[in-house]
Structure formats: structure tokens, C-alpha cells
A protein has these predicted regions:
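Short, charged helix-to-loop "capping" segments that act as catalytic/coupling loops
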Residues: 70-79, 113-114
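Metal-dependent catalytic neighborhoods of phosphoester/phosphodiester hydrolases
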Residues: 16, 49-67, 83-102, 106-108, ...
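His/Asp/Glu-rich metal-coordinating catalytic cores
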Residues: 87-161
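N-terminal active-site segment of His-dependent metallophosphoesterases
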Residues: 1-68, 75-76
Length: 161
């Protein structure tokens, strides 16, 4: 499978009072152009979509426009998105149910207990099915609440649990 992998978009970021809106819109437009040209099997956005956990309306609009342009491409390209440490898991997860029906799969929130599972997305190529388990950003303290007080020593140990 071929992917376009993006991370750390930090949409809405300002650099020393300089608004990066035009730069961000330009580079996201370039991504749309590359997706149109390369026709990947999926686009993976691995966290830090926004620069702040409560993004500005402008930042949300930029990301909305980006997803709208990507979702209009033919053939359709599935989009897999996970939240990062700068994102609000709940805000990023908003409308994920209906977006998933349109091929935009978002995992903002983590499972709240051991009975819940990570969001699984199954894609297919000429070799068969491929399963993706969307694991959003997690803090070691999260593991303690789900695994009855167990406390991992590091982020990597938390993910392994």
C-alpha cells in the first residue's frame, strides 16, 4: 500500500505574532495536489492537527477545507486521523461517526476501559485486507485508570500495555 503520511500540522499556529494561515493553506493545497497526482491508498494524519487544544474558528475552517478537498478526490482516498498531544481528543473526535461513513476515520478519544477497543479500519488493496488500529496520543497516567492502578514508567511502556 502507498500512503501519504502527515503529522504535526499545528494548524492555527502563529510564529512571533506572524499568522501562518496563508502558509498552512498553501502547504495543505500542495498535499491535495500530491494526493490527486499520486493516488495513494490512504492518507494518514498522525496527530497534532491543531496547535492548541481549543483551536480558533479559523484553524478549524482551514482543516475543514482541507478534508473537504481531499474527500472530493476521485478515486476516493481513505483518510485516517489520530489526535496528538496538542489536540483536544474530544474536539477532534467530533462528528467522527458520520465522517467515518464518508471515509474519514478519526480516533481522538482513547477507549475508556479494557472492554472497549481501539478504532479499527480495514482497507483493501490488490493483495487483500489490511487492518489499521488507530491509537491516539496517550499519557502514562491514562493507563493507570484503565489498568487498575498499573503505572508505566514511560510513554513507550504505556503504549505496550
Amino acid at each position: 500500500m502507498r500512503f501519504i503520511h502527515l503529522s504535526d500540522l499545528h494548524i492555527g499556529r502563529q510564529l512571533h505574532q506572524y499568522n501562518l494561515k496563508e502558509d498552512q493553506e498553501h502547504i495543505l493545497g500542495e498535499v491535495v495536489d500530491y494526493a490527486r497526482m499520486l493516488k495513494p491508498d490512504a492518507i494518514v494524519i498522525a496527530g497534532d492537527v491543531y496547535d492548541k487544544s481549543v483551536p480558533s474558528a479559523e484553524a478549524v475552517g482551514i482543516f475543514d477545507c482541507f478534508l473537504t478537498e481531499l474527500s472530493a478526490l476521485k478515486p476516493e482516498i481513505p483518510i485516517l486521523i489520530i489526535s496528538g498531544n496538542h489536540d483536544s481528543a474530544q474536539r477532534l473526535d467530533y462528528a467522527s461517526g458520520i465522517l467515518g461513513q464518508k471515509g474519514i476515520y478519526i480516533a481522538g478519544k482513547l477507549p475508556q476501559n479494557q472492554e472497549e477497543f481501539l478504532k479499527k479500519v480495514t482497507l483493501q488493496d490488490e493483495y487483500g485486507e489490511v487492518d489499521f488500529y488507530l491509537l491516539p496520543f496517550l499519557k502514562p497516567g491514562y493507563v493507570r485508570t484503565v489498568f487498575d492502578g498499573e503505572m508505566p514508567e514511560s510513554y513507550s511502556k504505556a503504549v505496550q500495555m
